[in-house]
Amino acid sequence: QNTKSYEIGADLTFFNGLVTLNYTYSRQNVKDQIFEVPLAGSTGASSMIMNGGKIHTNTHEVTLGISPVDTKNFKLDFAFNFSKIDNYVDELAPGVESIMLGGFVTPQVRAGIGDKFPVIYGKSYMRNNEGKIVVDQNGLPMQGEDAVIGTVSPDFRLGFNTNIELYKFRISAVFDWKQGGQ
C-alpha cells in the first residue's frame, strides 16, 4: 500500500505564555490498501488478499492551554483538547462494494465504498415514511433491511486535564469524553 499525507498547523501563544492555542489539520490518502477480498464460490476459494482500495483520513485537533499561576512554589495549568478523525473508503477492488472485516453473522464490521471506515453492518429497524421506527402489535421494533447501523470510530473526542504543583508535590486530573462509535 502507498500513503501520502499532508499536515498543516499553527501554534499561538498569548499574554506571555498565559494562553496557548494549537491547531493541526492532516489528510492521509492510502491507495492500494491491503484487504481480504471475497471471491465467487466457483473459484474454490472464499477470498484472496490483495491491494484493493483507497481510503482517506481527515484529522482536526485543537488544544487550548491556560496557565493562570506560575510562581516558584505554586503552579496551576489547564488544557482542553478536541480531536476529530474521519476515515472514508473511496474505492475497493473492481466489482466489490463492501468487504467484511469481522463477524460471521450480523452484525458485522465492514468497509464499504462511500462509508466511514469501518462501519457496523446488520439488520436495521423498519421505519415509516416519517422516519419513525415501526413496531408490531406487542410494541417491539420490526426488523428492516441490512444496512449500516453504526460506526466503530467515535465522532469526536474531548479532553481536559489540570495540574496543580505546590513546592515539589504535584497532583493531576484528566477527563476524557468520546462521542459516538459503538
What would you call each of these model-derived segments?
Residues 26-32, 39-50, 144, 150-156:
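Active-site beta-strand/loop architecture of penicillin-binding DD-peptidases
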Residues 50, 69-152:
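Conserved small-residue
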Residues 1-44, 83:
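Membrane-embedded beta-barrel scaffold of Gram-negative outer-membrane proteins
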Residues 1, 37-47, 59, 133-144:
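Flexible, solvent-exposed coil segments and beta strand-coil junctions
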